[in-house]
Swiss-Prot record:
Subcellular localization, as worded in the UniProt entry: Cytoplasm
Complex formation: Interacts with RssB.
Protein keywords: Coiled coil, Cytoplasm, Stress response
Name of the protein in its database record: Anti-adapter protein IraP
Length: 86
C-alpha cells in the first residue's frame, strides 16, 4: 500500500512539473504574440487578426472534442488577438 501511495505521489509530481512547463510555454508564446502585434502597423495588425479569426472559424473540430473546449479556445484566441489593441 505504501508503495502504491509513493508511486501515485511520484506520478502526481511529474504531472505537476509537466503542467508548469506547459504554462511557461503558453505564457512565453503569449508575450511573443502580444509584442509582435503591438509592433505591427494598425492595418497589418487588423489584417492578421482577421486572417486568424477567419481560419479559426473555418476549422471544424473533431467530434470527440467537447463544444466547451472549442469555445474556450476560440475565446482565448480572440482575447489574445484583441489585447494588444487596448
Amino acid at each position: 500500500m505504501k508503495n502504491l501511495i509513493a508511486e501515485l505521489l511520484f506520478k502526481l509530481a511529474q504531472k505537476e512539473e509537466e503542467s508548469k512547463e506547459l504554462c511557461a510555454q503558453v505564457e512565453a508564446l503569449e508575450i511573443i504574440v502580444t509584442a509582435m502585434l503591438r509592433n505591427m502597423a494598425q492595418n497589418d495588425q487588423q489584417r492578421l487578426i482577421d486572417q486568424v479569426e477567419g481560419a479559426l472559424y473555418e476549422v471544424k473540430p473533431d467530434a470527440s472534442i467537447p463544444d466547451d473546449d472549442t469555445e474556450l479556445l476560440r475565446d482565448y484566441v480572440k482575447k489574445l488577438l484583441k489585447h494588444p489593441c487596448q
